């Protein structure tokens, strides 16, 4: 596999391209989250309605992830990613024409469907182009574009908003998608990217919903990483209303929480590869790291109790750092019990289940924001990852899994 991609640096180009596409996808989806205080004020939408708009994206994203996973596993990366990014680029621009609940929800749902290919494409690329002992870091690179996009969105989009308004910001997101499609037209000519794996010849079963390991994976991914969605979609509203910060100020500081997400991908990816090289029980190594994630995630409950913007941003940073650990380690767990033939579907199930959890919770948390029950919202968002960790401990117990030793 290494020889197909040329030298050491060239080997990482496909993963780097997936970093770029996940970065763009998160700029696209976070533009609404960043500008929510202004958009809600100008359109008259409530926090609960905003939650339903987020849910429209999340439901479509949830349904699309396993679909794109199957498409990418069978039709290949080149065609699958070209179709997906073309779809979401059009949907992103459609936000510029929205003005109410239903138009925003429709544009958001179309965006969610297209972006459902992001993480299946990233994992498919990593397992197809990198050797096994580099896949933890490769996954961190491919997936970290999302967290990097969340970091960069306020820094890039805020000036565009100040110059051309929130509708102009959505036009900009469409142009970024077109730029990536041009890059992909070149990178996807590489033989290891163009290759279509013949999944049908695999002798190992893929993920099935009656398999306890699938539910263990879903618990970690969907519930453990839920604070990422909560912070992404609610941080601007929390800073604007109870803390009284302006849209311009929010744009200057909202990169701080997702920086924890970005750093978490790199740290947890490195720790995962380090644990793999040590050998021993994969499950025990994952259990130790997941315990660290669970303990660290508890500090998020303090957010509504601390004074000042700086303290709030620090706690959000730590929450996203811990949540990224749940995400990386859940994928490492799934890759240890299923073969690379099912990589796209694995990523699709994980990201889809996370999106389903966000779709269920955001209207509820949005309603709590409407009635100023901020403490309850943060405490619920803190408790959910602990439930995911406990669920994984129960469902992944050795001796009940079969297959590989995890």
Predicted feature locations:
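Juxtamembrane intracellular "pre-TM" segments in multi-pass secondary transporters
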Residues: 2-7, 191-218
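Helix-breaking motifs and short loop linkers at transmembrane-helix boundaries and internal kinks
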Residues: 44, 76, 97-103, 131, ...
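Extracytoplasmic gate region of multi-pass secondary transporters
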Residues: 32-33, 212-266, 327, 331
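A late C-terminal transmembrane helix in Major Facilitator Superfamily
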Residues: 335-371
């Amino acid at each position: 596999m290494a020889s197909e991609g040329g030298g050491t640096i060239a080997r990482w180009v496909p993963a780097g391209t997936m970093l770029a596409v996940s970065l763009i996808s998160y700029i696209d989806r976070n533009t609404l989250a960043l500008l929510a205080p202004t958009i809600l004020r100008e359109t008259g939408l409530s926090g609960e309605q905003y939650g339903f708009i987020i849910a429209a994206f999340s439901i479509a994203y949830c349904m699309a992830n396993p679909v794109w996973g199957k498409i990418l596993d069978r039709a290949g990366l080149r065609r699958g990613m070209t179709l997906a990014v073309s779809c979401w680029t059009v949907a992103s621009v459609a936000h510029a024409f929205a003005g109410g609940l239903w138009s925003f929800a429709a544009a958001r749902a179309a965006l969610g469907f297209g972006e459902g290919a992001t993480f299946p494409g990233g994992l498919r690329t990593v397992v197809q182009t990198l050797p096994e002992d580099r896949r933890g870091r490769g996954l961190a690179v491919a997936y970290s574009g999302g967290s990097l996009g969340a970091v960069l969105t306020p820094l890039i989009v805020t000036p565009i908003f100040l110059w051309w308004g929130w509708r102009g910001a959505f036009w900009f997101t469409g142009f970024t998608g077109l730029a990536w499609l041009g890059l992909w037209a070149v990178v996807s000519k590489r033989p290891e990217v163009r290759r279509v794996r013949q999944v049908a010849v695999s002798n190992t079963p893929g993920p099935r919903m009656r398999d306890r390991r699938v539910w263990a994976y879903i618990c970690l991914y969907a519930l453990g990483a839920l604070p990422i969605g909560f912070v992404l979609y609610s941080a601007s509203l929390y800073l604007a209303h109870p803390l009284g910060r302006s849209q311009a100020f929010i744009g200057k500081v909202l990169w701080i929480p997702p920086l924890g997400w970005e750093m978490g991908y790199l740290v947890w990816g490195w720790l995962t590869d380090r644990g793999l090289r040590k050998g021993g029980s994969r499950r025990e190594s994952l259990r130790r790291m997941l315990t660290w994630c669970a303990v660290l995630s508890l500090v998020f409950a303090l957010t509504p109790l601390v004074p000042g913007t700086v303290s709030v941003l620090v706690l959000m940073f730590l929450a996203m750092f811990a949540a990224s650990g749940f995400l990386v380690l859940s994928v490492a767990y799934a890759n240890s019990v299923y073969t690379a033939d099912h990589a796209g579907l694995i990523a699709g199930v994980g990201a889809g289940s996370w999106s389903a959890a966000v779709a269920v919770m955001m209207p509820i948390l949005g309603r709590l924001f409407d009635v100023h029950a901020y403490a309850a919202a943060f405490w619920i968002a803190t408790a959910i990852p602990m439930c995911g960790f406990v669920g994984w401990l129960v469902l992944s117990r050795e001796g009940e899994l079969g297959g590989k030793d995890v």
